[in-house]
Amino acid sequence: MEVLMAERANLVFHNKVIDGTAMKRLISRLIDHFGMAYTSHILDQVKTLGFQQATATSISLGIDDLLTISSKGWLVQDAEQQSLLLEKHHRYGNVHAVEKLRQSIEIWYATSEYLRQEMNPNFRMTDPSNPVHIMSFSGARGNVSQVHQLVGMRGLMSDPQGQMIDLPIQSNLREGLSLTEYTISCYGARKGVVDTAVRTSDAGYLTRRLVEVVQHVVVRRTDCGTIRGISISIRNGMTGRILIQTLIGRVLADDVYMGLRCIAARNQDIGIGLVNRFITSRAQPIYIRTPFTCRSTSWICRLCYGRSPTHGDLVELGEAVGIIAGQSIGEPGTQLTLRTFHTGGVFTGGTAEHVRAPFNGKIKFNEDLVHPTRTRHGHPAFLCYIDLYVTIESQDILHNVNIPPKSFILVQNDQYVESEQVIAEIRARTSTFSFKEKVRKHIYSDSEGEIHWSTDVYHVPEYTHGNVHLLPKTTHLWILSGGPGPCRRSIVPFSLHKDQDQMNLQSLSVEQRYISNLSVNNDRVRHKLFDLDPFWKKKGGVGYSGPDRILSNGHWDFIYPAILHENSNLLAKRRRNRFIISFQHDQEREKKLPPRSGIKIEIPINGILRRNSILAYFDDPRYRRSSSGITKYGTIEVDSIVKKDDLIEYRGAKELRPKYQMKVDPFFFIPEEVHILPGSSPIMVRNNSIIGVDTRITLNTRSRIGGLVRVERKKKRIELKIFSGDIHFPGETDKISRHSGILIPPETRKKNSKESKSKQLKNWIYVQRITPIKKKYFVSVRAVVIYEIADGIHLATLFPQDLLQERDNLQLRVVNYFLYGNGKPIRGISHKSIQLVRTCLVLNWDQDQNGSIEEVYASFVKVRANDLIRDFIRIDLVKSPISKRNDTAGSGLIPVNGSDRTNINPFCSKARIQSLSQHQGTVRTFLNRNKEGESFLVLSSSNCSRIGPFNGLKYHNLTKKESIQIKEDPMIPIRNSLGPFGTVPKIANFYSSYQLITHNEILLNKYLLLDNPKQTFEALKYYFMDENGIIYNPDPCSNIILNPFDSNWYFPHQDYCEETCTIISLGQFICENVCISKHGPRIKSGQVLIVHVDSLVIRSAKPHLATPGATVHGHYGEILYEGNTLVTFIYEKSRSGDITQGLPKVEQVLEVRSIDSISMNLEKRFEGWGERMTGILGIPWGFLIGAELTIAQSHFSLVNKIQRVYRSQGVQIHNRHIEIIVRQITSKVLVSEDGMSNVFSPGELIGLLRAERTGRALEEAICYRAVLLGITRASLNTQSFISEASFQETTRVLAKAALRGRIDWLKGLKENVVLGGMIPVGTGFKGLVHHSREHNNIPFEIQKKSRFEGEMRDILFPHRELFCSCLETNFHDTSEQSFMGLNDS
C-alpha cells in the first residue's frame, strides 16, 4: 500500500468512463507491469471504491425518469408518410409485395435506429444525471437497446416463425401499447422466451460437443520441430487492429529480415513491440506457427500454440488448451442467448453506401455502359457492370466520381442534381461466406375474379401440365372483378348453363350453380354469335342477339367470332381463287320441320384462315347427351394381367392389337348425375349411401336418378355424384383393380363359374371399386352407353355436294373430333345438352400453284338486292394485306404513294406504324339489326388505326374499283364519323345500340347519368376494341357476371376526348391514378370495357406487379377465389445477425452441414485446386500440392466464417481457439483404395499423420482423400472408445469396440475421469513426460542442412498429402494402379 501511495503523486488524474473493454486492457497492462498478485490487490481496491461510490450515489429509478425523446413525433410522422406513399405505389402496381415489405421494414428500422442514436445526446443535453441514462451505459443492468424500448419506440418485432412483422410498434413502454401493438409485442416476447429456453439448451449442447472433440488436446512438448508456417503479409491492406490481434501471442516459424538484417529469429514469440517494428519496417511476409502446423497427432506443442491468453507468457506444459478452446467458443453462445429483446433480422444485404453530389450541377456519364433496372425497393435505376466515371459539372468546377461495378445509378444522364443528393448506391460487399437464405413469399388474392397477365409465360419445368407459370419479365397480374356466377347475391336472376355460355334473362333454369372446372390448353377464347331458337321466342325469352363464348380446346390460337345460322342451306359458287358461299333462309321450311342442328361457320376476327383450320362444323344430334358422365374411347383389348377373371380393361391410346375385334371404333359414355354445390350448403344424404329417385339432396335440389351417392369436398365447393346401377360385394377370390374403372364386354363370365347362364352379361358394363373408410370395399356396376362412329357418314346430307369437290386449288374435308378427353368427367347442367362428337369441315388448298401462301383471307359479304339481304363468305387466296413499318417520329397512316402525314400527335412517338398499300383496302357496308341502313367504313386489314384527326386520305375498293374520298366536315366532329378517337378501325358485327345486362332504363339512367331516359338507346353507342385496335360489339355476358349493383362498373362521365392525354384502346388495362385527360377525373384501375362518345365504362380490376422469376398460380382467364395463392416470389434475405440466430450458423459450420454453402464451396475448391496444380506440375505432384493447398484453404475459410458470426455481436474470440477445433475437424482422412489390406480397410477414417507415418514405415503409398468431419462425427471417431461411449450412442459404440477388440490407451482427460484415474494435465504433468531427444545440441551446420532437407520433404511430401512415401523410395516405382484409384476417387 505504501508503494502505491508513494507513486500516486506522480500519476495524472484520468477522468474517463471505463467500460468492459477498457477494464480488460487495464488489467492486462497491470499484469504486465506488476504481476498477478499485485494486480489482484489493486482490483480489490477498485471494487471497494466502486461499492462505496454506488452507495453514496444511491441511484433509484422512477417512472418520471423515463423521458421520451422530443424528436420522436415528427420522425414517426415522417415514416408514416413514407409508408402511406409506399402503400399507394403498391396499389398503383408500381412495386410488388416483396419490395413493399422490404422497404417498409427498412423505413421503420431506420427510424428506430435514428431514435436510438438520438437518445444519448438527448439525455446528455437535457438531463445528464438521469438514472436511466447513467444505468443504460454502465453495463451493470440493461443495454441501449432495452432502454430504447422504454423511451424511444419498441420498433419491429418477429413473428413466431422468426419473420419480420412489417407493422411496427410505434409506442414505447413508457407511453403504453395499444391493443394491436400489445398483440404484436406478445409474439416477439413469447418468441424471445421460447428462444431463450431452446437456444440456451442448444448452446449448452454445442459447448458439450466442442469440448468432446478437443478434450484430449493438451500441451505435451515444447517444440514439435515443424518448419511449416502460415504467411501473413502486411501489404495486403490489413488494418492495424486486425494485424495486431493476429500476430500478438504467436511464435515465428522463420526468421524475419529487413533487407539483409534479421530483425526477429525463428521460434521467437511476438509482442507488441515486435509487431510495431514489423508495421513500421513493412517487413516481408511473416511466417507464424499455428495449431494447424503442429506435427503432433493428438497433442500440441508450446511453440505452435503460442502465448497463453491468461498471463501472457508461453503456454505451460500440461495445460488443457483443448477444453479451454471448446469453452471459449461455446460460452458466448450460452451467455448471449439471454438477449431476449432482439429486434430480429432486418432486410438488408449489408447497408449500401450512398454516393452524394458534392455541389449543385449537371451530371454526365456514358449511357452505353449502363442499362435500366429496378432497385430492391422497386425504384427505377441504372446498373453499371464495369467501373463508371461520373462527371458533375457546375459553372466553374468539375468533379469526377468513380462508381464501382454492380452499383445503381439513381439519376439520369444530363440531369441537374442538388448538393448532397444521392446519385448512386454502391452494393454492399457480400463475400461468399455471408449468410443469405432464399425465402419464398406467397401473395394471396384479396379479391375474387378473373386472372389476366400481359406477357408470355413459361411453364415451370416440374409443372408442365399444371397451372404454375414462370414469368420471364416484369409484368402486371390483373384480377378482374366479378364473382364466379350467380353464387354472388345478385338482384337480377341469371342462369348459368355450361362454361361461358349465354346468360338469358327470365330463363327457365334459375338454379344457383357453380362453374365447372375449366379445361383449357392455350388459354384463348373464341366467340360465336347466334340467333336464338324459335323455341325461346315462343317461351317469352329475350329475343335480342347476344354473344356466346365457348372455350377452345387447344386447336385454335385466335379469338373467333362465328356466325350461326339455324336451318340454313349452303350454296357455294366459285370464281377463280375465291369461294363465295351464300346462306338462304327458308321461312316456309322452318315452319314444317322441327328445329335441327345447323352448320356453324367459323371465321376469325382478323379474317385470316391458316392451312388446316376449321371453316365450319356440324354437331350431330346422335352424339348429344343431356346428363353428366365420363367418356372412354381408344383401342379395346382383353387385359392380359388378370387372367383369372378375364376382365377387359381400357388401355389408353396405345397401338396394340385388339383381342376384342370390332367393325368400327366405339366409344363409351358412362352416365352419372353430378351436383356442384357451394361449400356451405347442407347436404341431406351421406357419402356411400344408396338413394332412390327424386330423393331430396339439399333444401331445393332433388335427385333425378337413384343409386350410390359419392360426396367429394373441394375448396369452397362440394361435388356430389350419383351412380346408377348395381352394388356388388365381391368374394375373397375376386381381384378387382384398385385403379380406375374397368369396362367389361358382354357375353363374358368367370371361368369355372357355377352361375347360371342367365346371369351372363348382355351389355357392356363399367365396374368401379369403392373403398369406404374403415369398411370393406364394394364394387359399383353401371350400365354403359355405346356410340359407334361410322366411317360412311353421308357428307352430302351435311354439306352441299359442290362444296366438297376438290377444285380450284381449294379442298374441304370432313373430320370427326372428340370434344372431351378420354376419361375426363363431363359436367352437364340441367336443360342443356352436351355434344360429345363434332364433325368439322377442314379447309386446305393446293400448295403447288400457290406455294408461298400460308394463309387465306376470309370475309363475310352482305349483298342487298331488291330489299333481300344475302350473306356470302368470300375466301381470297391472297397474302395478308398488312405491312408494318416502325417510325420514331409519330403514329399515323402512311400511304404508300408518299403523301405527307398531317396532324401527328406529339405524344405518340416510338409507336408502331402500320401502312396500307394502295390496292389492299376493301370497303364493305354493314347493315344494323334495326335495318336503318347506316353504313360504316371498314378496312379489310387488321391492326390498322390512326390517332388524331387527319385530312383527305384515299381508300380504294377492290370490288367496285372506285375510290372514296373522306373529307373533314367542319360541322361534324371527326370522332363521330371515325370512331371514338378519330380512328378508322375494323368494325365487326356492329350494333347501333346495345344494352347492359339489365333492361331497366331507370337503372341505366341512374348509373350512366343520362338526362333523358328516352335517349337511352340512342346515347349508348358502344364500341368494344381488343388490343389490336379492332372494334367489335361489347360482350358483357361472359362467364363472369358484371353486375352494376356490385360496383364492378365505373363510369367517368366526362367529355375527356377533347384533350386526350393518353391513347385509350378497348380492352386496355389502366392503372389507378393515370391521367387520361387534362381536366378529367382520376380513374380507378381496371380494364376499358366500353367506349362511348363522351364517356367510357371500366371494369374494375386490381393490379399486382410481378418481377421475373416469380411463379403465377393459375391459368390466363381462370377464376381466382379470395384467399387463393396468386403469385410466389423468391428473394434473397440476409439472415439475422442476432447471436441467438447466429448460434445455428456456428453449429452448421462446425458440423459441416451440406445445407450450408461452406461444404459446397470447399468441394468446388478441392476440385479447382487439384485441376490447376495438375495442369502446372503434372499428375502426381500437382495432385499432392493441390490437396495440401485445399486443406489449408478450408482451414482459413472455416475460421473466418466462425469469427464473422461472433464479431458481428462484438464478441472477441482468439483465432487459436477456433483453430484447435477446426484442426480436429480436418484431421481425419478416408482410405479410398485397398492398397494396404494388412493395415487399413477402404472407407476407414484414420488420422492424417498416422496414415503418413504408417506409409513411411511400410515404404508403401497409401491412397486416401481428405474429408471434413462435423464435430459430432469427430467426437465419435476418436482413438478412445470410452470417450465416444460417454458422449452418445453408448450401446452401439461399446458393441463395435468389443467386436473389433479395440484398445483404449487412456490418453485423454475424459476416459481417465470415467475410470477414476489421474488426469494427464496440469502442473504435475511434467514428471510424467519423458523428454524426447533435444535438438539444441546439434551443430549449426547440420541443423541448417536438416532444415533444408525438411523443407524439401515438406514441399514434395507434406504431411497431409494423399500419398505417403519417402524421398529414399524411387517415386516412379509406385504402381500406376494407385494413381488410377486416386483419379477414380
Curated annotation (Swiss-Prot):
Its main location: plastid. GO terms for molecular function: DNA binding; DNA-directed RNA polymerase activity; zinc ion binding. One of its GO terms (cellular component) is mitochondrion. Its EC number is 2.7.7.6. Keywords: Chloroplast, DNA-directed RNA polymerase, Metal-binding, Nucleotidyltransferase, Plastid, Transcription, Transferase, Zinc. Zn(2+) binds at C224, C294, C301, C304. Its cofactor is Zn(2+). It catalyses: RNA(n) + a ribonucleoside 5'-triphosphate = RNA(n+1) + diphosphate. The keyword Transcription applies. Pfam families: RNA_pol_Rpb1_4, RNA_pol_Rpb1_5. GO terms for biological process: DNA-templated transcription. Binds 1 Zn(2+) ion per subunit. Transmembrane segments: none annotated. It is found in: Plastid, Chloroplast. It is an enzyme of class 2 (transferase). PANTHER family: DNA-DIRECTED RNA POLYMERASE SUBUNIT BETA (PTHR34995:SF1). In plastids the minimal PEP RNA polymerase catalytic core is composed of four subunits: alpha, beta, beta', and beta''. When a (nuclear-encoded) sigma factor is associated with the core the holoenzyme is formed, which can initiate transcription. Belongs to the RNA polymerase beta' chain family. RpoC2 subfamily. DNA-dependent RNA polymerase catalyzes the transcription of DNA into RNA using the four ribonucleoside triphosphates as substrates. This is DNA-directed RNA polymerase subunit beta''. It comes from Illicium oligandrum (Star anise).
